[in-house]
Amino acid sequence: MNIKRVRRISSEIKKVISSSIINSLKDPRIDKLNVSVTEVKVTNDLSFATVYIAVIGDDEKKKQTLEGLNKAKGFLKKQIGENVDLRHVPQLIFKIDETSEQSMHIENLIKSIHEENHNEN
């Protein structure tokens, strides 16, 4: 499959899912203000789309959000089918994106090292 097409489809799916989370999903487990789609990776054969989401909150909040999104897979696939020009809509796989939390942790470590060095001088 053409890599440009796969990237374009990934981008379009990301837009549709993001919009659906904000405007259409009614599941109380999904806090629209604290959930964002960070990336979508579609396989070259377009059969699977891994959707990475960032959730602000504790592990229980993340678990509930994943449950809500998995429950809404059928609806989200329908939205993708209506808005993205595809013969077959890929299976959706939702995963928590931990990169933002990891980067914040690293940033905090760097700040604490900087403060320790500053206090020693």
UniProtKB/Swiss-Prot annotation:
UniProt keyword list: Cytoplasm, Ribosome biogenesis
Subunit structure: Monomer. Binds 30S ribosomal subunits, but not 50S ribosomal subunits or 70S ribosomes.
Protein task: One of several proteins that assist in the late maturation steps of the functional core of the 30S ribosomal subunit. Associates with free 30S ribosomal subunits (but not with 30S subunits that are part of 70S ribosomes or polysomes). Required for efficient processing of 16S rRNA. May interact with the 5'-terminal helix region of 16S rRNA.
Protein location: Cytoplasm
GO biological process, one term: maturation of SSU-rRNA
Gene: rbfA
Superkingdom of origin: Bacteria
Main location: cytoplasm
Homology family: Belongs to the RbfA family.
A GO molecular function held by the record: ribosomal small subunit binding
Protein name: Ribosome-binding factor A
A GO CC term attached to the entry: cytosol
